[in-house]
From Swiss-Prot:
Cell compartments where the protein resides: Cytoplasm
Lineage of origin: Bacteria, Pseudomonadati, Pseudomonadota, Gammaproteobacteria, Methylococcales
Assembly with partners or alone: Homodimer.
Family note: Belongs to the DTD family.
Protein name: D-aminoacyl-tRNA deacylase
Length: 153
């Protein structure tokens, strides 16, 4: 499982012109589910999304987590993060989970974070979305929770 996380002052996602998810200060996470991902990756990624220390403390050091700040979490599915870009000029999406598995595990990640934190907002799985954000810093990190078995394995 891959998550590209960004510290934001605000973020929202629209589908067909309607806002389906929005947060104020917090974390926008673009999430890709990979082949071989399962409950282990869901649990670990939920823990990392809520616990990753990327917010400033009183001395302006990145010492506080999303859970500690009470900020919002906006989860947006983005299978393209799982692309293999090593060869040629066109990405291969072989490492990405199939849509059914991707939806099931993305929904499980949403549930896992919502049980531990509020507010949590989401985009719409599989939809053509427009994501709007104001990146704070900018601060952006790539989090990985490797699959139990290698993609394609």
């Amino acid at each position: 499982m891959i998550a590209l996380i960004q510290r934001v002052t605000q973020a929202s996602v629209r589908v067909d012109g309607a806002t389906v998810g929005a947060i104020g200060r917090g974390t926008l996470a673009l999430v890709a589910i990979e082949r071989g991902d399962g409950a282990t990756q869901v649990s670990r990624m939920a823990e990392r999304l809520l616990g990753y220390r990327m917010f400033p403390d009183s001395e302006n050091r990145m010492n506080l987590s999303l859970a500690e700040t009470g900020g919002g979490l906006l989860l947006v599915s983005q299978f393209t993060l799982a692309a293999d870009t090593a060869k040629g000029m066109r990405p291969s999406f072989t490492p990405a989970a199939d849509p059914e598995t991707g939806r099931r595990l993305f929904d499980a990640l949403v549930d896992a974070t919502q049980r531990r934190h509020s507010p949590v907002a989401t985009g719409r799985f599989g939809a053509d979305m427009q994501v709007f954000l104001v990146n704070d810093g900018p601060v952006t990190f790539l989090l990985r929770c490797p699959p139990d078995r290698p993609p394609g394995g």
